[in-house]
Design a protein with these regions (language model features):
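Alpha-helical scaffolds flanking conserved acidic
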Residues: 45-50, 79-85
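Short cysteine clusters
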Residues: 61-64
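Short alpha-helical scaffolding segments that buttress acidic/His motifs in well-ordered protein cores
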Residues: 30, 34, 50-57, 85-90, ...
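General structural signal for alpha-helix termini and helix-helix connectors
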Residues: 36-39, 70, 74, 91
Length: 120
């Protein structure tokens, strides 16, 4: 059975909330880093999210893939931009990155369908 990528982010949210409550200083610092990194400067936020997706594939983090696919889509990334980024991740990560790139593409398809109101 194929993973439900939107479902994965939904499943993680309560656990992330618990983590924020249990380690508030660490999570506030992490949030501050994320905000600083994602602020548009030389690269816009969309580009940074697409880069983060490529890194997520290269480091083989399914949870990261789910969150960064959604963020890239929400920032206006296109399927072609995501595919080009996945190609770069595959180039750098070889075989295992091919498998995680397929995860990212499945996540993109599901989040894109959800955004347009389709049930996946």
């Amino acid at each position: 059975m194929e993973a439900s990528w939107p479902g994965l982010t939904d499943q993680l949210r309560p656990h992330l909330k618990d983590l924020r409550g249990g380690a508030p200083e660490v999570m506030k610092a992490f949030s501050a880093i994320a905000q600083a990194v994602l602020a548009p400067k030389a690269l816009d936020t969309k580009t940074k999210e697409v880069v983060a997706l490529g890194i997520s594939v290269a480091i083989r983090c399914d949870d990261c893939i789910a969150f960064h696919v959604k963020a890239a889509l929400d920032q206006g990334a296109t399927r072609d931009e995501v595919l080009e980024t996945l190609g770069t991740a595959i180039y750098l990560g070889a075989g295992p990155s091919v498998m995680y790139a397929s995860h990212a593409l499945a996540a993109w398809t599901q989040f894109e369908a959800a955004k347009s109101g389709q049930v996946f």
